[in-house]
Amino acid sequence: MKKIQISPSILSADFSQLGNEIKRLEEGGADMIHVDVMDGHFVPNLTIGPPVIKALKKHCSIKFDVHLMIAPVHKYIEAYSDAGADIITIHPEATDDLENSILKIKSFNKKVGVSLNPESKIDLIKDYLEKIDLVLIMSVNPGFGGQKFMPEVLNKVKQLKEIQSRDNMNFDIEIDGGINFDNYQSAIEAGANILVSGLSLIHIS
């Protein structure tokens, strides 16, 4: 069984204190930091860009798990790679050529993640599972923090776990959205090994 990892999201953090927030999370035992990048187009919210990630990366050693909710995503991959992303996760709906975008991320020696929204089917990515490092299952509709967990997505997590076991694959299964002490165990039991949440969950791993 894979080690359970916690990737705290900075989406709800005090953006004027991001450096201190990340340092606090790192010292608290986080395995990585989840950075949500939104463009106001692919999702209805705006967050941070490459210069902020680059500045933050200078002051910490923890891995940055960067979730790109931007379209078209392909042309921004290099900028986020250069900024210091360790994992770059993209949505299949945000690129005209998912395989080419996966290869581009790999060309910068970054780990590749592909994200599925609550309504997105596994069929969208099943042909690429051998080529990626991580599948991110959204358990809320992307765009804003603080939404309620959608338990129906756990069926998708279970399906991915079955594919992983059947075909002897090694990708991580990450879940993001409304994860808390009431539901994290069900996410783990379904097959998730990376939980995106706040500081409160750090010590469960």
What are these regions (language model features)?
Residues 202-205:
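Conserved small/polar residues in nucleotide/adenosyl-binding loops
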